């Protein structure tokens, strides 16, 4: 009798699961799709984690930070005329005052507004390029100091 009862419970559970609507978590409102939300605010809004193998982000309208090297080596960038690499002293002063890198949103801004992957990836690439230039400058200084020492 116990086995029959257990079998009936399992059978009922399986049939109830099979009858669930697999799209119950989807919402469409004003041409916008929501997954896990009833109030989508973009073309596709997902509330929760997304598991994917790859994400492709179009850079339409964005300027890749090649302007960092262009400005450094040419003294000017046609891609981004207003860009200039700040000195390490200026950078340190900015950090002491703001507690984050220039052109990088503050923790508070990220918390309240979120981040755009396209924008943040471009900012981070700019910072990597700037760090590369600072490192190259420091290496030149190290090499010059080594040469001075070896001359003595």
Residue ranges and their predicted role:
Residues 1-24, 91:
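Bacterial Sec-dependent N-terminal signal peptides
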Residues 63-109:
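Short, positively charged
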């Amino acid at each position: 009798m116990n086995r029959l009862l257990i079998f009936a419970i399992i059978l009922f559970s399986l049939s109830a699961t099979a009858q669930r609507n697999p799209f119950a978590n989807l919402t469409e409102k004003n041409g916008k799709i929501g997954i896990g939300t009833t109030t989508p605010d973009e073309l596709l809004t997902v509330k929760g984690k997304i598991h994917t193998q790859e994400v492709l982000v179009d850079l339409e309208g964005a300027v890749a930070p090649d302007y960092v090297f262009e400005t450094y080596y040419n003294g000017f960038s046609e891609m981004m005329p207003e860009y200039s690499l700040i000195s390490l002293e200026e950078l340190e002063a900015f950090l002491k005052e703001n507690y984050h890198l220039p052109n990088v949103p503050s923790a508070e801004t990220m918390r309240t507004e979120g981040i755009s992957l396209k924008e943040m990836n471009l900012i981070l690439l700019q910072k990597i390029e700037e760090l590369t230039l600072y490192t190259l400058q420091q290496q030149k200084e190290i090499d010059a100091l080594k040469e001075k020492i070896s001359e003595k």
